[in-house]
Structures are given as structure tokens and as C-alpha cells.
Amino acid sequence: MKNVDYKLYLVTDRKVLKERDLYKSIEEAIKGGVTLVQLREKEMSTLDFYESALKLKKITETYKIPLIINDRIDIALAINADGVHIGQSDMPLIKARELLGKDKIIGVSAHSIEEALEAERNGATYLGVGAIYNTSTKGDAQAVSLEELKNIKNSVKIPVVGIGGINEENANKVIETGVDGISVISGILSAQKIKDKARVMFDIVKKNSTK
């Protein structure tokens, strides 16, 4: 897929939403400026994940933004999602690319220049680099400083997205490193007015972007 806008990358987490409806919340976030959505549900059955992905795909297609599936290549293939995001301990990138084909988006988590360069060599579409700040949604996240984020961005040619604990207060510092976008969970989904918060975050990215 060409010309993907990584500016404001929303990752789902039902725990953050609590009792609020996932699909309405995601739609509100998209209306506020989210440019990319990743369905990430680690504790869901395959059937529930599949059905959730199908519902979410209808929304993302309506607004013409990509839907990325976290880890589950089988689900991505089953619903013809725009791509997947995989971590360092998930299926090898080369095998994922073989299964998905050359046109699908494949994002890879990276925590160092070495991991970033290897992912780029093996065909990653973009990199998710972090955690930049402490995050409650991924307790085992490896820390990456802003300086390291900047160095990783400067070492590769593919897009880089900063991830981990990014919110309204610190988003500008992340964007100023030169990255292509920020990945947000709680920074948007924990807000009472999700659409308004997404708009604030989008404006911060746009204002501070070096691109």
C-alpha cells in the first residue's frame, strides 16, 4: 500500500475504554484525526478477534484509512486487512511477508538501531519504536530514549512511529525527533471526549512535525 499517513496511529485496548463501545470510540477517534488504526487484543478468542476485525474494517474502509492487525496474520488474511504489526518475538518478518505478499503493510517493533536495520533489510514497511515513556498498556515494554528514537529514525529510510505512553503533554517532544508519527492508546481512548482529544493530538503532530 502506497502513501500511508502515519501521523496519528491509534492502537485499540478495550481495558482503557472500560464499558464504552469500541467501534463508536474508534469512529470518534477517526473523525478527530486518527490516520491509521491497529486492532490489538491479546486476550480475545480467535472467533471474537475475527468478528471484531470485520466490524472495525467496515469503519476504517468508510473513512479510507488503513486497518492493521496486531500479530495475528491469520486474522489479517481472513479479513483482507491492510497489514499487520509484529514484535521481535512474533512470526519472523520474512515469513510474514511471504504469507501476506509484497503490497501489504508490515510494521515491526524495534528497540535499537540493529533491530531497525534488520527489519528494514527484511522488508518492513514501517517501524514502531519504543516505549518512549512509561505505559500501563504494555507492562513489559523495553524503554527507548528520545535520543535513541532520533538515531533510529536517522538510520533507516522507512517510516518510523514513536510508541509508548505518548499523550498530549509529551507528543511534541516525540515528533520533534523527526519521526513520521506517534502511536497512541490511552492518550486518546481514556478521554471523555475521544473525538476532541484526537483532534488535539493531531494538531500537535501537525504543528511540531519536521516533515
Swiss-Prot record:
Enzyme superclass (EC): transferase
Xref: InterPro entries: Aldolase_TIM, ThiamineP_synth_sf, ThiamineP_synth_TenI, TMP_synthase
GO biological process, one term: thiamine biosynthetic process
An annotated GO cellular component: cytoplasm
Keyword field contains Metal-binding: yes
Residues where 4-amino-2-methyl-5-(diphosphooxymethyl)pyrimidine binds: Q38, L39, R40, E41, K42, N70, S109, K138
Required cofactor(s): Mg(2+)
Coiled coil stretches, renumbered: none
Record's function text: Condenses 4-methyl-5-(beta-hydroxyethyl)thiazole monophosphate (THZ-P) and 2-methyl-4-amino-5-hydroxymethyl pyrimidine pyrophosphate (HMP-PP) to form thiamine monophosphate (TMP).
Family: Belongs to the thiamine-phosphate synthase family.
Protein's name in the database: Thiamine-phosphate synthase
